[in-house]
Amino acid sequence: MIAPLVPVDIEHELSVVERYFAGDAAQRSAASISSELAGADLVVCDELDFGAMAAAQSAGVPVAAVAVIASGALVRPNRLTDALEALRVGLGTPAPIRPRGDLFVVPFAPAMRDPRFPAPGNALWMRPEPGPAPRTEPYIVATLGTEFNTESGNLFDRILTALARVGTPATVAVGPDLDPARFGPQPSHVRVEQYIDLDAELSRADVVLHHGGSGLFVRSVLGGSAQIVFPMGADQPFTADRVRDLGLGYVLDPVTVTPDAIADAVMSVRADQRVKGRVEALRRETLALPTPSTVVARLQAPANSAAREQ
């Protein structure tokens, strides 16, 4: 079943981080990890796992938080003060919870981050896995992820109608919860699948249509693809802002966009050499970041210090 589309409510998405990730989910995470910390030298968690950060801090274990939001705009520490204070009190931790850990690993290029929400001073920039080298051709990949795919109304149908009109080879990944057969017969140049090897497919694609998840954003850049984004929730509207502001493609309203508008956007963005140049420049910037092994060496310093103190 696919739920109807609703307009993006940015305030709601921000409040989910505050009420859920820094609230109920953090309480549960802290409770589950606390018993595992004896003898630990370092805790590595994603930037939304405030419970792991709090439990580690309470136990005196250094924390490396890993950014998972490319734009940096979804997680706003100034909105988390009350929730993190409740978490601190519950754990009996004397000092305020540090919502960025001791080190903050960022596997995205600095330009991908919204300048209104800069990385903290303890940031370690890290190159993501490069994936296959781009060999772009007239080929389109479309996906709406594995959560918002079932909250997308008739957006898949509109995308498929647009791809039929464009006429170049395309693959649409609908996710594990949807049967490709529900979308009916498609032209021979359009393939509908539950799963695809995204890295392999993105390295071929000159255009990627997606929902705006941070992972698809960075993987599309590394694949050398222009992007058309249909933001529906979570961090997606902020990712869409970066795609637009960096000139990497177009942002379309998932609620109102027509098949003709989608097709026109595909043909326009693939013909724009300026977009291709910006994508390639950002790809080079991303690949020039410090390697994971370099970052791991930096992470070992606080871990070794903690081990000596035990």
Kindly give the residue locations of the regions a language model identified.
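Conserved nucleotide-sugar phosphate-binding/catalytic loop shared by glycosyltransferases and other
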Residues: 1-20
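Conserved nucleotide-sugar donor-interacting segment of glycosyltransferase catalytic cores
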Residues: 22-91
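Structural motif
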Residues: 41-42, 103, 139, 207
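Short, polar loop motifs at secondary-structure junctions
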Residues: 47-51, 109-113, 131, 174-180
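A short helix->loop->beta-strand "cap" motif at the edges of active sites that frequently abuts
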Residues: 59-62, 168, 225
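Nucleotide-activated sugar donor-binding and catalytic core shared by glycosyltransferases
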Residues: 66, 73-82, 86, 94-95, ...
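Donor-nucleotide binding loops and adjacent catalytic segments primarily
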Residues: 118-121, 125-207
